[in-house]
Amino acid sequence: MAEITKFGASEVAFHIKHDLREIPEGKSYGNEAINKEQSCNNYSLLNGRCQTAEEANKYRKELEKEIFKYNRKNLVHAVEVVVQCPVDCPLEQKEDFFRVSYDHICSTLPMGERCVFVAQVHVDERVKDQAGNIILDSHGNPLSKDHLHVMYVPGVPDTKHDGFKYKLCADQLTKRARLKEFHP
């Protein structure tokens, strides 16, 4: 139901573009289940903030200036949580499901909603069987894999470094015990 991925500095921009469906013309999303005609129905939960990949990446970089970072090559600059909507969720409750999921994720982050730079609901991906065929529901409509992408800067409280309230530390936010609190 939920998946967590960590990204280094060089990976973040591409994944923001993927989540916001801003892959350049002629390039592939790497996911053939995406129905591009339905991509216009995807929506953000950020209330006007970070609506383009450029805005989101700029916001992330500005926020990182306020956060202590160790000088490491393998430093995690972003964490993404993908929350899948249950198949049995009634259509009229999907928006509420994603909003409650987003609010819960933000409530577990030391920096709260401020560190989130992508919160995008995808309704444009279809379910395929193992042979690669799109699965249809009882009415002949393609089954949808609606899900929420939340990307955030993994800032945690910092008491060691003067001038910084937070430091980058994805490990503190993605430990097994902490993940079990999110989804036992």
Regions found by a protein language model. Give the residues of each.
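N-terminal nicking endonuclease/strand-transfer module with a His-rich metal-binding environment
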Residues: 1-184
